[in-house]
Amino acid sequence: MVDDAGTAESQRGKQTPADSLEQLRMLPLPPPQIRIRPWWFPVQELRDPLVFYLEAWLADELFGPDRAMIPEMEWTSQALMTVDIVDSGNLVEITVFGRPSVQNRVKSMLLCLASFHREHRARAEKMKHLEKNLKAHASDPHSPQDPVA
């Protein structure tokens, strides 16, 4: 037989998710990430950025987790980019710095990739819906089974 003191003592060692969240809130915020202009990027091209918006889920597809692909994209395109979350996480603001021709090329490339990912997601959802319907049809005992030739 277990007494109440023993159970209370064993529960003290365990942390609930709420306790963990409180401990995280007590920690100081990390310092802001400071970006230094790369040596290959001219200062005068920081003056007139190109800004456009995409859905937040697309930013994860395009730039990878934690925006890890941005430095490589910047290097290959010779443009600087910032990706900031706006509109309570539904949209991201993409700012492209560089020569106007480079800005337009980067925007075009990102919009083409976004279109590809939208189509891919729509096809995946359509396939899931089709599979669900086929499983429901196959499990229905009243549906006539077509003989396979």
From Swiss-Prot:
Top-level taxon: Eukaryota
Annotated GO biological process: actin filament organization; embryonic pattern specification; establishment of spindle localization; establishment or maintenance of apical/basal cell polarity; positive regulation of double-strand break repair; positive regulation of double-strand break repair via homologous recombination; positive regulation of meiotic nuclear division; protein storage
UniProt main location, coarse: cytoplasm
The entry's keywords: Cytoplasm, Nucleus
Matching Gene3D superfamilies: K Homology domain, type 1
The keyword Ribosomal protein is assigned to this record: no
GO MF annotation list: RNA binding; structural constituent of cytoplasmic lattice
Skewed-composition ranges (Polar residues): 8-18
Domain KH: from-to ranges: 49-110
Disordered: region residues: 1-23
Similarity field: Belongs to the KHDC1 family.
Protein name, as recorded: Oocyte-expressed protein homolog
Native organism: Papio anubis
